[in-house]
A protein has these predicted regions:
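Short coil/turn helix-boundary motifs
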Residues: 40, 44, 121, 170-171
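Aromatic-rich transmembrane-lumenal/periplasmic boundary elements in polytopic membrane proteins
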Residues: 1-16, 190-220
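Coil-to-alpha-helix initiation sites in intrinsically disordered, low-complexity, charged segments
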Residues: 125-128, 173-176, 218-220
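Alpha-helix initiation and N-capping motif
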Residues: 1, 30, 34, 77-80, ...
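Membrane-embedded helix bundles of polyisoprenyl
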Residues: 58-71, 75-121, 128-169, 183-202
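Membrane-interface helix-loop-helix junctions at transmembrane boundaries of multi-pass membrane enzymes
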Residues: 170-182
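Membrane-interface coil-to-helix junctions
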Residues: 1-61, 83-108, 219-220
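Short, intrinsically disordered/low-complexity patches at protein termini
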Residues: 34-36, 116, 176
């Protein structure tokens, strides 16, 4: 309705309660890069919906294929992983809850880049490390921008735990440990910059909540 009126980035939703900030809601996908699919003028709304779902299923399959190749699986295993993940019930069923379908589509790129990083760390390949940082950060950022920061946080926790385990194990050299910590810092910085348009409005809107200044303990 807003798009038909020429308002592609609505800032206020007056139909939710007494009014609500659209950018301030963490589940809104206002700045998600694939959102313009919903504005294609030559398609009907059901066709846009179908295109959006199919595109993300293809992205999910591609991401898992990327992860499978980084794990050195053969072509048959990689293709099986692509089909079994993209068409699995937990992923395919999210066509009815699109923000989770969007985040599921980027998980493969997230963990595939981590596998690439571990290999690059072992062989001290700086270019491969840099590529892994970019792919990992952008995949996490896409999860946040699509309105599912919870999955992004879960992936970030698993990634941080894996990297910390890698750099602080046994006889790891100081240089390798510093590179691992540098990866975490670089990834966090890049994610914060890419998603600033998302988390800054959410943080500012949260400051309007009475719970921010409340001294009452809940449920007591």
């Amino acid at each position: 309705r807003c798009a038909s009126a020429g308002e592609y980035f609505p800032l206020w939703n007056r139909r939710e309660g007494l009014g609500n900030s659209v950018p301030g809601q963490v589940s809104s996908a206002l700045y998600y890069p694939l959102r313009p699919i919903w504005f294609l003028p030559w398609l009907s709304l059901p066709q846009r919906y179908a295109l959006f779902v199919v595109l993300h299923i293809l992205v999910a399959a591609t991401g898992i294929g990327f992860a499978a190749r980084r794990l050195a699986l053969n072509k048959t295993a990689a293709k099986f992983a692509m089909v079994s993940y993209a068409l699995s019930c937990p992923v395919l069923f999210q066509q009815y809850n699109l923000i989770y379908l969007c985040s599921a589509a980027w998980i493969g790129f997230c963990f595939g880049s981590l596998s690439d990083l571990w290999r690059a760390q072992y062989h001290e390949q700086r270019l491969a490390c840099g590529r892994s940082i970019v792919i990992f950060s952008l995949s996490i950022s896409m999860m946040i921008l699509c309105g599912d920061p919870h999955t992004a946080v879960n992936c970030g926790i698993l990634a941080a735990a894996g990297i910390l385990l890698l750099i602080f194990r046994g006889q790891t050299r100081i240089e390798s440990r510093m590179r691992g910590l540098g990866f975490l810092l670089s990834a966090a910085t890049l994610i914060a910059l890419v998603t600033a348009v998302r988390w800054i409005p959410a943080w500012r809107w949260s400051q309007h909540s009475n719970r921010v200044e409340s001294t009452v303990t809940p449920f007591l």
